[in-house]
From Swiss-Prot:
MF-aspect GO terms: structural constituent of ribosome
Coiled-coil intervals, chain numbering: none
SUPFAM superfamilies reported in the protein's UniProt record: Ribosomal protein S2 (SSF52313)
Any Gene Ontology biological process: translation
Annotated PANTHER family: 30S RIBOSOMAL PROTEIN S2 PROKARYOTIC AND ORGANELLAR, SMALL RIBOSOMAL SUBUNIT PROTEIN US2M
Gene: rpsB
Name this polypeptide is given: Small ribosomal subunit protein uS2
Bilayer-crossing regions: none
Length: 241
């Protein structure tokens, strides 16, 4: 089963929080101390919490649950996309558009427009337009792909959110809370853990740490999915008998 050890976390710098003056007092239970005015996160808390989160994500995935990866900070953007694609899940890695979850009906219309434009760009429709019209549609296509490309095949609301930075993605977390969608999130020492169902105290800036979380989550999701496929195969085998 996908798990992460304390050694893995130490090597990735998961224990380095933010400067002490930027701390959120609600994170006090997860802080070990401070060194050179930087908070040190207590990995004895983080390791079991992260592994519990991985086990739960695996369970959701084994029930065909959809996981939405959210990380719109520039540094994490590419890693978020890679991890989601790696486990055939969904992602938002540029700007979070307000209402992305709570106003799904409107988002669905924008996704339809995106898919229509994709077809037009491939079937020669763009070639029949004036240069200006073709350019405008290409720009619209790129803009929609940027914001909705990672969720265009989600087909409905996700069953869980995995968030890289609770502070930066507070709007996404609030929307998930309003809809009762469980939130799994990395929470650094400057962040508010309220609204996060599965708190993972850790560094949300170092790219090595971010990749460690994302790869472990992708592995857990893949394990859950293969468990689901194994059950399906077993059931069809029993029916065939």
């Amino acid at each position: 089963m996908a798990t992460v050890s304390m050694r893995d976390m130490l090597q990735a710098g998961v224990h380095f929080g933010h400067q002490t003056r930027y701390w959120n007092p609600k994170m006090k239970p997860f802080i070990f101390g401070a060194r050179n005015k930087v908070h040190i996160i207590n990995l004895e808390k983080t390791v079991p919490l992260f592994n519990e989160a991985l086990a739960e994500l695996k369970k959701i995935s084994s029930r065909k649950g959809k996981i939405l990866f959210v990380g719109t900070k520039r540094a994490a953007s590419e890693a978020v996309k890679e991890a989601a694609n790696n486990c055939d899940q969904f992602f938002v890695n540029h700007r979070w558009l307000g209402g992305m979850l709570t106003n799904w009906k409107t988002v669905r219309q924008s996704i339809k427009r995106l898919k229509d434009l994709e077809i037009q760009s491939q079937d020669g429709t763009f070639d029949k337009l004036t240069k200006k019209e073709a350019l405008m549609r290409t720009r619209e296509l790129n803009k929609l792909e940027n914001s909705l490309g990672g969720i265009k095949d989600m087909g409905g609301l996700p069953d869980a959110l995995f968030v890289v930075d609770a502070d930066h993605e507070h709007i996404a977390i609030k929307e998930a809370n309003n809809l009762g969608i469980p939130v799994f999130s990395i929470v650094d020492t400057n962040s508010d853990p309220d609204g996060v169902d599965f708190i993972i105290p850790g560094n949300d800036d170092a790219i090595r740490a971010v990749k460690l979380y994302l790869n472990a989550v992708a592995d857990a999701v893949k394990e859950g999915r293969s468990q689901d496929l194994a059950v399906q195969a077993e059931e069809s085998f029993v029916e065939a008998e």
